[in-house]
C-alpha cells in the first residue's frame, strides 16, 4: 500500500539536511525508509543494511523508491543444483 498523497513523501530530517549541505560527498544513513527525491540525483549514499554500509549511486530511475530497496539485508545463497545421474 502506498503512502497518502496528502501526507507526501517521507524523508528523514537529518538526511534532508545532509543532502542540501553536502551535495558532492558521500552521505551515510541508517534511514532505509526514506524516499528518493530529485535532489538526490548524482549523489553517493551509503545505506546501512544491518551489518555494514552499501554504497549506492542515485540515478534518475530511482526517484520515488525507498533507499532500503537498493541495500539488501539478507544474502541470497543459490538453491542447490540437481545432479543428473547416468542411467545404466
From Swiss-Prot:
InterPro entries: Ribosomal_uS19 (IPR002222), Ribosomal_uS19_bac-type (IPR005732), Ribosomal_uS19_CS (IPR020934), Ribosomal_uS19_SF (IPR023575). One of its GO terms (molecular function) is structural constituent of ribosome. Keywords: Ribonucleoprotein, Ribosomal protein, RNA-binding, rRNA-binding. PROSITE patterns: RIBOSOMAL_S19. Protein S19 forms a complex with S13 that binds strongly to the 16S ribosomal RNA. PANTHER family: RIBOSOMAL PROTEIN S19P FAMILY MEMBER, SMALL RIBOSOMAL SUBUNIT PROTEIN US19M. This is Small ribosomal subunit protein uS19. It comes from Carsonella ruddii (strain PV).
Amino acid at each position: 500500500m502506498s503512502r497518502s498523497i496528502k501526507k507526501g513523501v517521507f524523508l528523514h530530517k537529518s538526511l534532508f539536511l545532509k543532502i542540501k549541505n553536502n551535495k558532492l560527498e558521500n552521505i551515510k544513513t541508517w534511514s532505509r525508509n526514506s524516499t528518493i527525491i530529485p535532489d538526490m540525483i548524482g549523489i553517493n549514499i551509503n545505506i546501512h543494511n544491518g551489518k555494514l554500509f552499501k554504497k549506492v549511486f542515485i540515478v534518475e530511475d530511482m526517484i520515488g523508491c525507498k533507499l532500503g530497496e537498493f541495500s539488501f539485508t539478507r544474502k541470497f545463497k543459490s538453491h542447490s543444483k540437481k545432479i543428473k545421474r547416468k542411467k545404466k
